[in-house]
Amino acid sequence: MSNIPADLKYVASHEWVRDEGDGVVTVGVTFHAQELLGDIVYIELPAVGQVLAEGDGAGVVESVKAASDVYAPIAGEVLEVNADLESAPETVNADPYGAGWFFKLKLVNPADMASLLDAAAYEKEVG
């Protein structure tokens, strides 16, 4: 599958994680997730300052076909959210790994990154 960037980490619930350094990561949903959802029409993001455990609900994505929860792929405190998605949720369809990012986390334990899937393992998940 060509839409799985090798420089990111992933979880089976279709979120991606980009290591920004200094214990900060950017989180979004994968190309596969947005493809399954179809045209995204609404996004609910977590609150800045919210502390999320791995697997916690961190938002909602609604499309013309379905609604889906977004989960925290790793434990951390929400530092920033992509407020542009509130007025332009379709950005996730157009650029899920770039301008369509959801939120940034300050990790509780940066070593937790080792438990995430690499691109090859995620490709097997969605295979």
From Swiss-Prot:
<comment type="function">
    <text>The glycine cleavage system catalyzes the degradation of glycine. The H protein shuttles the methylamine group of glycine from the P protein to the T protein.</text>
</comment>
<dbReference type="InterPro" id="IPR011053">
    <property type="entry name" value="Single_hybrid_motif"/>
</dbReference>
<dbReference type="GO" id="GO:0005829">
    <property type="term" value="C:cytosol"/>
</dbReference>
<comment type="subunit">
    <text>The glycine cleavage system is composed of four proteins: P, T, L and H.</text>
</comment>
<comment type="similarity">
    <text>Belongs to the GcvH family.</text>
</comment>
<dbReference type="InterPro" id="IPR017453">
    <property type="entry name" value="GCV_H_sub"/>
</dbReference>
<keyword id="KW-0450">Lipoyl</keyword>
<dbReference type="InterPro" id="IPR033753">
    <property type="entry name" value="GCV_H/Fam206"/>
</dbReference>
<feature type="domain" description="Lipoyl-binding">
    <location>
        <begin position="24"/>
        <end position="106"/>
    </location>
</feature>
<feature type="modified residue" description="N6-lipoyllysine">
    <location>
        <position position="65"/>
    </location>
</feature>
<dbReference type="GO" id="GO:0019464">
    <property type="term" value="P:glycine decarboxylation via glycine cleavage system"/>
</dbReference>
<dbReference type="GO" id="GO:0005960">
    <property type="term" value="C:glycine cleavage complex"/>
</dbReference>
<dbReference type="Pfam" id="PF01597">
    <property type="entry name" value="GCV_H"/>
</dbReference>
<dbReference type="InterPro" id="IPR003016">
    <property type="entry name" value="2-oxoA_DH_lipoyl-BS"/>
</dbReference>
<dbReference type="InterPro" id="IPR000089">
    <property type="entry name" value="Biotin_lipoyl"/>
</dbReference>
<protein>
    <recommendedName>
        <fullName>Glycine cleavage system H protein</fullName>
    </recommendedName>
</protein>
<dbReference type="InterPro" id="IPR002930">
    <property type="entry name" value="GCV_H"/>
</dbReference>
